[in-house]
């Protein structure tokens, strides 16, 4: 390549004309049409023509000549129709040299300007040809369609980033957020980015919008969405992450209305035992509307007949129907301090299926004959018709337990049944339950519930007994069902005496995992030879499944097969795991929100253990575990009770900073 040769190279996606000043060791020193002198490797050159300039004419003259050449070539480029050229040659499917392409395009004698114009045109429009130095290969129609779609997508992406970042800046700079009806796509991109980060399908484009707009990448998207009114300041983000919906599909609501209409018609009671004469009661929380279990007791010989009655949801909810499918997809009701998401539509769970006082209801009744020591002498499980006489809260039941003979008898039997379980190796964790409640005004209350109060203890033990007897009944009758089993703890810290708070809290780390399986193994944690769950069919799908297996033994419906039960175990594993996360994290969030108002206050804490840079401590008043820096200077040991000061709290970022008071 001789000095004076006109060449072209690519700079910022544009062709630039230049003249060679020197060519040495595969490096080319050039003067450009923009009056810049630079050096490139010869492989950087896009085109070299056969026209040469006289370098002796001087720099200014050379630049003017280069600019004139560039103008000529641009005009020639504008005459080229790349699509038309492609339509002529694409069926040949072979490489075509530059000279031949230029002749096809312009006809007649071809100059360096013609060749350059073609190179420029094909460089700018990559849709129809791929090129390699001085030859070109036409893309197939399928390739053209694919490249065109990709180009349109990239253009849309660039527009979204540009428009999105401009709009985000406008929102953040304004006192009142602009209307966002036409910006739903941007909102969804930022929403997905904040919820899922790198797992978001919009991660790359969202990152560009955030960067170009100057938005804080960590909390900026959240603050923006709050300002727009898309989210509240206390938005439950896990509901979005897990795709949990409050509302029921219209088809489910229509199906539930049909069930209500059918439920108000006279119902045949063939095969059901009439137990409406029993003095039956429910004991639940103050705000409960979905009553799914009731208790009765009557003297029998030297002992008692204890009845645990479960609403017969399966009598109405057909297996595989729309209501059942929705309940299956939800897996369980979800209870949080500020929200409740039911498994079944409220018009069913809180009315037709609910064991409401004074209303006849179909039920599955577990009738256990107990001696005075609470040993089960005999039992039967029957489909029944029941009528609740009293609906008590835990609070009211506690007040009446020493005055009402029935409650007193149930309480005494519950205590004795628990003692039987404890002697069989049951592990009774005694930990306070923290009740967090957020009212409609956003006011937070945090209280401790004594799970060992008479009313809670008797309900708990009655339900454990019912679940145990149902497990034995299904096992002994050869009906497959989903059992819950648990091996003994890897290490036992708590003996029969109950243990300290430290021992109870630490014991949880050594518990064996609960296993769902069709094999009726022992549940060591409860001290029982078999166990399942039956008593909450309004709130837990597994309990509804158990109920159907019982009904199968009664001839009321076709039970699930073993294959179907295994599928249910597998299908419910994911929703049950995220429901646990939802409930635990939301409760922790509201406890931290409560503590945000107590910064500077002192709280009692218990040391759990010492780690490298911190102590792990428990705040007994809230039953949450957190860290305490080692730089306090004190030498603390597990079980030490200390006083800590709340330094900083941020519920949104899940941070709680303490110092030794």
Located regions from the model:
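Electropositive polyanion-binding surfaces
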Residues: 2-6, 10-16, 23-26, 35-46, ...
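N-terminal membrane-targeting/anchoring modules of bacterial envelope and secretion proteins
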Residues: 53-56
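Negatively charged, Asp/Glu-rich surface segments that serve as flexible interaction/assembly modules
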Residues: 58-61, 66, 133-135
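Mixed-charge (acidic/basic) macromolecular-recognition segments
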Residues: 121-125, 164, 170-171
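A short, conserved structural fragment
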Residues: 123-135, 231
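Accessory beta->alpha helical hairpin/"wing" motif in late/C-terminal subdomains of nucleic-acid enzymes
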Residues: 132-147, 239-240
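Short, amphipathic alpha-helical interaction segments positioned at domain boundaries
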Residues: 144-168
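Low-complexity, highly charged intrinsically disordered N-terminal segments
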Residues: 173-272, 277
């Amino acid at each position: 390549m001789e000095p004076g040769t006109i060449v072209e190279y690519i700079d910022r996606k544009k062709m630039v004309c230049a003249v060679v000043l020197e060519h040495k060791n595969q490096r080319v020193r050039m003067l450009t049409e923009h009056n810049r002198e630079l050096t490139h490797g010869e492989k950087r050159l896009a085109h070299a023509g056969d026209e040469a300039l006289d370098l002796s004419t001087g720099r200014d003259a050379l630049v003017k000549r280069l600019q004139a050449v560039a103008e000529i070539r641009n005009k020639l480029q504008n005459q080229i129709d790349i699509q038309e050229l492609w339509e002529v040659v694409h069926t040949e499917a072979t490489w075509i040299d530059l000279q031949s392409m230029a002749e096809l395009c312009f006809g007649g004698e071809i100059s360096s300007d013609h060749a350059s114009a073609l190179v420029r045109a094909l460089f700018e429009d990559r849709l129809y040809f791929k090129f390699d130095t001085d030859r070109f290969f036409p893309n197939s129609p399928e390739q053209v369609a694919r490249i065109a779609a990709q180009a349109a997508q990239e253009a849309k992406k660039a527009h979204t980033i540009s428009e999105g970042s401009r709009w985000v800046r406008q929102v953040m700079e304004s006192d009142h957020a602009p209307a966002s009806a036409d910006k739903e796509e941007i909102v969804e991109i930022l929403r997905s980015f904040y919820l899922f980060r790198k797992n978001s399908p919009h991660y790359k484009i969202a990152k560009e919008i955030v960067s170009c707009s100057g938005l804080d990448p960590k909390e900026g998207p959240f603050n923006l969405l709050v300002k727009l009114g898309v989210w509240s300041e206390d938005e439950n983000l896990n509901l979005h992450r897990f795709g949990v919906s409050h509302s029921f599909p219209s088809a489910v609501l229509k199906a539930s209305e049909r069930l209500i209409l059918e439920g108000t018609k006279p119902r045949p009671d063939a095969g059901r035992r009439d137990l409406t004469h029993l003095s039956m009661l429910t004991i639940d929380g103050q705000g409960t509307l979905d009553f799914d279990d009731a208790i009765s007791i009557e003297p029998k010989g030297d002992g008692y007949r204890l009845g645990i009655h479960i609403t017969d949801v399966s009598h109405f909810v057909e297996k595989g129907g729309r209501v059942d499918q929705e309940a299956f997809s939800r897996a369980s009701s979800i209870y949080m301090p500020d929200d409740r998401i039911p498994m079944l539509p409220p018009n069913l769970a809180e009315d037709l299926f609910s064991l409401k006082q004074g209303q006849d209801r179909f039920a599955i009744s577990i009738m256990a004959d107990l001696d005075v020591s609470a040993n089960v002498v005999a039992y039967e499980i029957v489909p029944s018709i029941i009528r609740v006489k009293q609906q008590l809260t835990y609070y009211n039941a506690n007040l009446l337990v020493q005055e009402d003979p029935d409650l007193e008898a149930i309480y005494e039997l519950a205590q004795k049944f628990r003692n039987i379980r404890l002697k069989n190796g049951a592990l009774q964790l005694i930990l306070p339950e923290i009740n967090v409640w957020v009212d409609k005004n956003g006011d937070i209350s945090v209280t401790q519930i004594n799970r060992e109060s008479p009313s809670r203890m008797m309900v708990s033990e009655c339900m454990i007994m019912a679940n145990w007897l149902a497990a034995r009944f299904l096992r002994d009758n050869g009906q497959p069902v989903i059992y819950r089993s648990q091996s003994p703890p890897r290490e036992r810290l708590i003996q029969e005496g109950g243990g300290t708070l430290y021992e109870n809290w630490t014991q949880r780390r050594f518990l064996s995992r609960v296993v769902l399986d069709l094999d009726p193994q022992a549940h060591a944690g409860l001290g029982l030879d078999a166990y399942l769950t039956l008593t909450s069919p309004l709130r837990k799908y597994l309990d509804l499944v158990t109920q159907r297996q019982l009904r199968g033994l009664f001839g009321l419906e076709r039970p699930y097969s073993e294959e179907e039960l295994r599928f249910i175990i597998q299908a419910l594993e994911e929703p049950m795991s995220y429901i646990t996360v939802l409930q635990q994290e939301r409760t922790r969030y509201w406890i931290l929100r409560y503590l945000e108002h107590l910064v500077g206050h002192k709280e009692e804490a218990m040391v759990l253990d010492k780690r490298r840079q911190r102590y792990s401590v428990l705040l007994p008043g809230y039953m949450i575990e957190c860290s305490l820096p080692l730089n306090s200077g004190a030498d603390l040991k597990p079980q030490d009770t200390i006083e800590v000061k709340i330094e900083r709290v941020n519920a949104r970022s899940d941070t709680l900073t303490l110092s030794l008071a």
